Structures are given as structure tokens and as C-alpha cells.
Amino acid sequence: MVRPRHQPGGLCLLLLLLCQFMEDRSAQAGNCWLRQAKNGRCQVLYKTELSKEECCSTGRLSTSWTEEDVNDNTLFKWMIFNGGAPNCIPCKETCDNVDCGPGKKCRMNKKNKPRCVCAPDCSNITWKGPVCGLDGKTYRNECALLKARCKEQPELEVQYQGKCKKTCRDVNCPGSSTCVVDQTNNAYCVTCNRICPEPTSSEQYLCGNDGVTYSSACHLRKATCLLGRSIGLAYEGKCIKAKSCEDIQCTGGKKCLWDFKVGRGRCSLCDELCPDSKSEEPVCASDNATYASECAMKEAACSSGVLLEVKHSGSCNSISEDTEEEEEDEDQDYSFPISSILEW
């Protein structure tokens, strides 16, 4: 009986496949992380069983990789108790081929590590003077505003050229936007939709702080822009001839505050907690009393049930540069926070 002979080629092929499997397994044994912390450890696990090449192909500057093939329990301990994974290898050691995105550039820091920093392109900016931002703050120029937007305020835009003002007198709003003065006498540029559709439901009616019923929020916005000052919302529904706050039903957790100056009620939020901060600016209220902040004034109004409004920033003993204009407009001061305009 003749026994079959094993072919040496088959054994070599088997060994070759086994080596290939072990090589692939070794290449995929690492873990990919989204950043390397200051303590040198990898944090925020992105994906397991990735090679360094696969992990670093994402192009992110902060992406890092660890070689150890560990179980889920070890990964959990690293992330929760140890401040991250040890033996962290950053994907990028230099700024070569690093894409930080628009408005940013890669630069080596003091520790000789690549970092994305804000570096907006300001070469095409023609206006070199100060600008007023959407946050109501004055920036020394548009480039400084762009840097602030890059760092922490992605929605920040230029409202108008020049310093932020207290009146609309010298404000030139861009495009079709209109200047409106808010409750604290700060000028804002607001874009309004002048074409308002007819209301489809009686629930759309709104009563303005001027005692006028508006068909919808759009109609109230339009009237605000035409007036040039904030009208504000008194309460939802048609205006009624109320004798007191007992006749007015407020919704959304609001409380009725009575305005003795015009003999009307207004629904206001009264659940705001005032922060214990010395950085708040005092305000002079319509009762000629000085409050530590606008929030403190609102708190006093909610406690008494009587509407209080800001006459001007600062103490009532201080002289406002716009006193004359405020006195001229006193009879038509239907001011309201700018946030109420932008919400609609």
C-alpha cells in the first residue's frame, strides 16, 4: 500500500497565510483617540482596532493613537480613573499637511507641538476703524471681531461700523436692516420681513406694549422696524381693556406686571435667578431707584407686581449723555429687550 506524500508547497502556503493574518492582526491592534491631553495621555476614544495609518488618515490635528490591544475593561479604567490612555502617539508632530479649517493656521507652540490658532484673513477689510458686533460690544476693528468669532462666538457678525451707540442717530445699518433701540438704550440693526402673510388662526394675535393688537409676530416685527424702537409683547391674544392684572391671563409661566404709567398690564417672566456678581452694571429704573443690575430690578418688579423699566445704565444720580433725547421720547417709550425682537 502506497501512502500519499505531503506536498511541501501546501505547507509553505499555509505558513504564509498564517503570517499574513498575524501581520494584519498586529496592524489593526491599536486604538484611535480624538486628542492628546496636557498630561500626555490619549483621551476621547474614537475607534478600536485601527492601525496608525488608518487612525491618522482623518487629518485632524489632535488625533492620536495607542498601540496596545487591550480589552474594554482596561479602556474603561484608562478613560475614567487614569486620565486617558498611556503611551499616546500624536498623529501630527509638525504643521506639515495640517488643515485647520477657515480662519485658522497651524503654528508650533512653545512646547514645539503643532496647534491650530485663529488667524483670519483681514487683507480685504477696507474699514480700519472700530465696529459694533452683534453681541453689543465694540471691537477695535473688524479683524479683532473675526478673531473673537473664531475663538468662542461662531455666530458673531458686524452690526455696523463705528462704536456701539446708545441711539440710532449716527448708526448706518447695512442692507435692508433697520436700527432699533432696546430697553437699555443700545442701538441694534435688525432685519425685518416687511411682507407678512395674513393670519390663519386667532391664536396668532398678539397684544403689543403699545396697546395695539397685531395679527401675528411678523406684523409686530414690521411695526417695530417702522417705529425705530422696540415695541415688545405685552401678552398673547387681542388687547383687552383690563382694569388690573386680574383681567389678564398670562401663559408660559409668566406673571402679569401692571404699568401704572399707561394703565396696562404686561406678562413677564419672573423665574430668573440673579447671579451674585460684582461685574453687573447698576441701572436706573422707571421708579427713579438705582438697582444693582437689570436682573435685580426685574426681581423687585416681580415681587411688587408693578412694571419697572430701565431708564438708563448706571446710577440714577449719574447724568446720561442722551438725557434730552430720552425726555423727548418719554411718552412713546415702549422699549423692550432686543432678545424679544430676535426670538420671532
From Swiss-Prot:
Residues 1-29 form the signal peptide. Transmembrane segments: none annotated. Glycans are attached at residues 124, 288. Residues 314-344 are annotated as: Disordered. Keywords: Disulfide bond, Glycoprotein, Nucleus, Repeat, Secreted, Signal. Residues 30-103 form the TB domain. Residues 94-117, 167-190, 244-268 form the Follistatin-like domain. This is Follistatin.
